[in-house]
Amino acid sequence: MIIVTGGAGFIGSNIVKALNDKGITDILVVDNLKDGTKFVNLVDLNIADYMDKEDFLIQIMAGEEFGEIEAIFHEGACSSTTEWDGKYMMDNNYQYSKELLHYCLEREIPFLYASSAATYGGRTSDFIESREYEQPLNVYGYSKFLFDEYVRQILPEANSQIVGFRYFNVYGPREGHKGSMASVAFHLNTQLNNGESPKLFEGSDGFKRDFVYVGDVADVNLWFWENGVSGIFNLGTGRAESFQPVADATLAYHKKGSIEYIPFPDKLKGRYQAFTQADLTNLRKAGYDKPFKTVAEGVTEYMAWLNRDA
C-alpha cells in the first residue's frame, strides 16, 4: 500500500493520479474533508481506502500498523501563506510531519514530503537548498523551514529514504478548492468564463515566478521514490517568468479578452515574494534529467483540462 496524506488536495491528488497512471491503486488517501468540495479531486481516481487526518495521526502516534507500506507521500499541510495562527500552523505542518517521519524511520518506509520555496523568503537570487539562503517571510514558510532543518539533522543517520521537495509556484488541475490561494491561471480562466476582464496586479511585469506544472511535480515525486534518492531538493523549472506569459497563454486559449490591471493590495506589501527561481543544480545532480513544461505548454494543457466540459 502507498499512503498519500493531503491526497484530496492539489498536489496530493495529482500524485494519486500519477500512481494510477502506473497501474497503482492500492492507495490510502488521508485528508481532512471538512471542506467537502475537495472530494471532486478524487472522483475520477482509484484508491483503496480513505481516512480522516485526525484518526490517522492518532493511529500513527499509537504505533499502529497499516500492513505493508511501500511509501508515504506527505502532502498534507496548511498551505496558506496568509494564515497567521502560528500554533495551528506548527501543529499541522511541523509536529504532524515529525510524527510521520519517525513512524517511517522506525519501519524503514520511504518518506517523501512537501517543503516549499517559501523557506527562502524575500530573496531575489540564489534559491539554493542551504541554510544561509533561507529566511522565510511568514509562519507557513517558517513551519516548512523548521521541518527541513529537523530533517537535515536526521538524514546522515537515516536507514531509509527521506526526501523533501521545495515546491515553487505550482499550477494545474485539481486546485479549484484552494480559492484565493489557487494559481493566477485558474483565476484568469474563471474571470474569462464569467464574462469579466481578467485581472493582474499593477506592476505584475516586475513580479517573476518559477511556475511549475503540477504534472511535472508528480513525475518528480514518483521518480525519486523509484530511485530511492534522499535529500532536500528544489522543485521548479529553473526559469523565472512574469505573470504576463501566464495571462498571454490563457487569452490565447480563449481567443478573447484583455488584461485589466488593478492596484496591489496593502495587506500583501512586504509579505509577497516578488521573485522565485529554483536552482536545479542538486535536482539534476541527483539524476532527474527530464525537461519541465514551459508556461505556454503548461497553461495551454491546463486550460484544456479546466474547460473540458465547456
Curated annotation (Swiss-Prot):
Protein name in UniProt: ADP-L-glycero-D-manno-heptose-6-epimerase
EC number(s) from the headed UniProt entry: 5.1.3.20
Cofactor binding annotation: Binds 1 NADP(+) per subunit.
Family, per entry: Belongs to the NAD(P)-dependent epimerase/dehydratase family. HldD subfamily.
CDD domains: ADP_GME_SDR_e (cd05248)
Lineage, top ranks: Bacteria, Pseudomonadati, Pseudomonadota, Gammaproteobacteria, Enterobacterales
GO terms, molecular function: ADP-glyceromanno-heptose 6-epimerase activity; NADP binding
Residue numbers binding substrate: 169, 180, 187, 201-204, 209, 272
UniProt-annotated catalytic positions: 140, 178
Domain notes: Contains a large N-terminal NADP-binding domain, and a smaller C-terminal substrate-binding domain.
Functional pathway: Nucleotide-sugar biosynthesis; ADP-L-glycero-beta-D-manno-heptose biosynthesis; ADP-L-glycero-beta-D-manno-heptose from D-glycero-beta-D-manno-heptose 7-phosphate: step 4/4; Bacterial outer membrane biogenesis; LPS core biosynthesis
NCBIfam families: heptose_epim, PRK11150.1
